[in-house]
């Protein structure tokens, strides 16, 4: 019984997430946090353009609140809208920008490289941008734009990488855009420091991540079919 309740709650949370992403995608959806309290359910939306989500006199927020309560059975939902702190380091915002650029007629290379450079300039330690679909010709394939330290597996891959996804609707079909960024606050397990035991002074640091950043300042683009 507990397992079924847990599954139902997870499904409800996913449906709420999908609904809010759809409602706020034009405002540059960044992320969402949802927390139950004794007074109701607090939902915080991080977007690139908060004004579009709030609406005139809070009309948009009021409409979403009513939908969450009636359609999704969320108890006393309270929505708070906040600005994304670093939009150029938020994978969801970046993925949406790339999708919009593709829909405006940008080539996939221009859209990918431009976003990659902007993310690098913002201070990202590792970035992966993947555009998939019929990007050129009739055959579906994908193009990757990679920079710095990107983790694919283990705890660094699941907890250290922030992931965002969006789609671009073109005449040739739908293109998928996936963006992964190494969380600036995540400490990689291969990072360690050497301290002066006598005085407790930090005398040096060593990290494979730092080496990768120094050696890979230029983005490496890879293409596969």
Swiss-Prot record:
CDD domains membership: KH-II_30S_S3_arch
Superkingdom: Archaea
Alphabetized GO MF terms: rRNA binding; structural constituent of ribosome
Annotated KH type-2 domain residues: 16-85
GO CC annotation: cytosolic small ribosomal subunit
Family: Belongs to the universal ribosomal protein uS3 family.
Cited function: Binds the lower part of the 30S subunit head.
Name the UniProt record assigns to this protein: Small ribosomal subunit protein uS3
Species in which this protein is naturally found: Thermoplasma volcanium (strain ATCC 51530 / DSM 4299 / JCM 9571 / NBRC 15438 / GSS1)
Primary gene name: rps3
């Amino acid at each position: 019984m507990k397992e079924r309740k847990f599954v139902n709650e997870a499904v409800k949370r996913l449906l709420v997430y999908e609904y809010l992403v759809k409602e706020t995608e034009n405002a540059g959806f960044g992320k969402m946090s949802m927390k139950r309290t004794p007074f109701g359910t607090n939902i915080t939306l991080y977007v690139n353009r908060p004004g579009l989500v709030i609406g005139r006199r809070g009309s948009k927020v009021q409409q979403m609140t009513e939908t969450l309560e009636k359609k999704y059975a969320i108890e006393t939902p309270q929505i708070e809208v906040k600005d994304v702190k670093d939009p150029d380091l938020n994978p969801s915002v970046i993925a949406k920008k790339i999708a919009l650029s593709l829909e405006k007629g940008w080539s996939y290379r221009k859209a990918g490289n431009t976003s990659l450079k902007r993310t690098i300039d913002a201070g990202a330690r590792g970035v992966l941008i993947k555009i998939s679909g019929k990007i050129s010709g009739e055959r579906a394939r994908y193009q990757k734009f990679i920079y710095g330290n990107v983790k694919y597996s283990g705890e660094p891959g699941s907890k250290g990488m922030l992931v965002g996804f969006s789609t671009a609707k073109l005449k040739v079909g739908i293109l998928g855009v996936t963006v992964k960024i190494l969380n600036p606050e995540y400490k990689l397990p291969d990072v360690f420091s050497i301290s002066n035991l006598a005085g407790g002074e930090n005398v040096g640091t060593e990290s494979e991540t730092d080496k990768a950043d120094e050696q890979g300042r230029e983005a490496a683009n890879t293409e596969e079919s």
